């Protein structure tokens, strides 16, 4: 399996901002101190489960599931979680941008967000590579040039090239390892598409057609510039965003200027692009590529976005389906911003901004799920309008990464288990960041417009009915609702409304959970 997840955009999206650990705050990132030297030689159990509730990257293979942004993994269907001990990722500003798992080889592309001139710039931070199934990881530097790398030999031509010498705008948005020959491919936006034949120790540029050509071949002389940027000499088609080596060994490279195919290992290329017809790309920005292998030859599914460079049908969000090596192209889910794909035989799962889409007829018709309910508790749901960023199917289990947790289904999407970062009420070792509490609320502060509801966590000794009261700063009751709880830890939700259905004003609110003889109290800060 290769990368599973959203590829955050240079222009629009910053999924993995740095977050500190504070009890009851908006993000949960908890763990022991890091190792040194950038290498990992130990596995650390995560007592709090997954370490972030926004799951943008996901890979499941042979019963193991790996999730971002901190390389959590589980071998028992999410019952317990671990992470590698590495100071290149955990406890730093770095986050997982891409991951590919092929048997015992795990390649993780990491990046961060730098602030330059008041703007957040996504930045390459290198790679973590394991060849022993994740027991240890080695660090590799980002895929950059030296100042002297201002030309590129391509067949009979020596082309002018722009040296990419800084890591800003070159994060590893996608990565794919080819177990057949050991080649490693990365899509790094401003650094383009690159290949390594020595497990990331060195990298070479991959030359794609410029914006004014749809075919290139090494025996033909050219004079275009290899320049992954906008501008008179630059090419959108040199700005790499996704890459896939399919089971036949064909190389597919998605860029901001189209989808490129090589049948000779990445030398000669043919470019597909949107032309306004239904037999072309929906949009020229290819942010994700996945292979459906139950067809012969395989079918390639592309998340094709509007680049903003052209309008009309050629610039729509949607899914482009390429069959028979690209000789047959059709479109689906027009208007949907799609991030990822997974397959179970003929069933197709698509992760999108508006939910999870499921097709059993090769994308001609779709069912969709926009809100997920936990089968263990009727009151446990994902937030309305949560985005679905990533999806994977492995050994009968459907894994879905959302902006509000990791989801697992054992029955192909009919019922769900919701997994969140699980900060305990009574930790085995209490600390300032994870204190011993009878109750807490999250996210806190709470914004109804952004969060939809706040979750109140508490523990009941028995199954019974109770009430939760919300008070304003003057201790006036603004909301009361009944709860039916199970023995153990429970979560209830408040939508930020008063008893008249009117959103409450900004300020501090207090809550009281009444469960028979037990009462738990906490505070919620509402900021809209």
Name the predicted role of every residue range.
Residues 26-45, 72-89, 124-144, 194-206, ...:
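Asp-box/BNR beta-propeller loop motif
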Residues 396-434:
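Short, compositionally biased serine/threonine- and acidic-rich segments at solvent-exposed termini, linkers
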Residues 477-504, 516-520:
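Glycine-centered tight-turn motifs at strand-turn-strand junctions
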């Amino acid at each position: 399996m290769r990368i599973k997840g959203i590829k955050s955009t240079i222009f629009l999206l910053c999924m993995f901002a740095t977050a500190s650990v504070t009890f009851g705050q908006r993000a949960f990132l908890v763990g022991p101190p890091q190792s040194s030297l950038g290498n990992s030689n130990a596995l650390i159990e995560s007592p709090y489960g997954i370490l972030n509730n926004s799951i943008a990257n996901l890979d499941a293979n042979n019963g193991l599931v790996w999730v971002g942004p901190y390389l959590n993994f589980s071998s028992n269907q999410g019952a317990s979680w671990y992470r590698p001990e590495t100071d290149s990722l955990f406890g730093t500003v770095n986050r997982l941008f891409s991951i590919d798992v092929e048997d015992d080889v795990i390649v993780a592309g990491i990046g961060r967000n730098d602030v330059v001139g008041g703007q957040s710039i996504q930045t390459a931070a290198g790679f973590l590579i394991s060849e022993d199934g994740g027991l240890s990881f080695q660090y590799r530097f980002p895929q950059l040039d030296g100042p002297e790398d201002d030309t590129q030999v391509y067949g009979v031509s020596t082309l002018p090239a722009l040296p990419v010498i800084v890591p800003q705008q070159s994060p590893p948005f996608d990565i794919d390892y080819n177990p057949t020959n050991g080649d490693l491919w990365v899509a790094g936006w401003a650094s383009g598409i690159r290949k390594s034949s020595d497990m990331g120790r060195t990298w070479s540029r991959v030359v794609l057609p410029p914006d004014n050509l749809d075919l290139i071949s090494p025996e033909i002389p050219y004079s275009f510039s290899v320049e992954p940027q906008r501008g008179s000499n630059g090419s959108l088609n040199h700005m790499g965003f996704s890459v896939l080596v399919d089971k036949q060994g064909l190389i597919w490279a998605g860029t901001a200027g189209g989808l490129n195919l090589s049948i000779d290992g990445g030398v000669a290329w043919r470019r597909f692009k949107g032309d306004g017809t239904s037999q072309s790309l929906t949009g020229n920005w290819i942010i994700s590529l996945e292979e459906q292998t139950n067809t012969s030859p395989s079918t390639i599914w592309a998340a094709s976005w509007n680049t903003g460079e052209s309008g009309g049908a050629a610039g729509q969000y949607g899914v482009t389906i390429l069959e028979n090596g690209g000789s047959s192209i059709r479109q689906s889910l027009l208007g949907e911003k799609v991030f990822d794909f997974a397959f179970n035989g003929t069933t197709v799962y698509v992760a999108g901004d508006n939910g999870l889409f499921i097709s059993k007829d090769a994308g001609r018709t779709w069912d969709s799920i926009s809100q997920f309910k936990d089968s263990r508790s009727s009151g446990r749901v994902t937030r309305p309008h949560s985005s679905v960023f990533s999806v994977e199917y492995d050994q009968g289990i459907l894994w879905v990464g959302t902006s509000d947790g990791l989801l697992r289904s054992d029955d192909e999407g009919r019922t769900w288990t919701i997994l969140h970062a699980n900060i305990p009420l009574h930790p085995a070792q209490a600390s300032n960041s994870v204190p011993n509490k009878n109750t807490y609320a999250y996210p806190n502060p709470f914004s109804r417009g952004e969060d939809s509801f706040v979750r109140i966590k508490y523990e009941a000794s028995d199954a019974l009915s109770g009430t939760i009261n919300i008070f304003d700063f003057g201790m006036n009751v603004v909301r009361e609702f009944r709860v039916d709880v199970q023995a153990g830890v429970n979560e209830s939700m408040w939508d930020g409304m008063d008893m008249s259905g009117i959103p409450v004003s900004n300020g501090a609110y207090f809550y009281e959970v009444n469960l028979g003889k037990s009462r738990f109290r906490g505070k919620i800060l509402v900021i809209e």
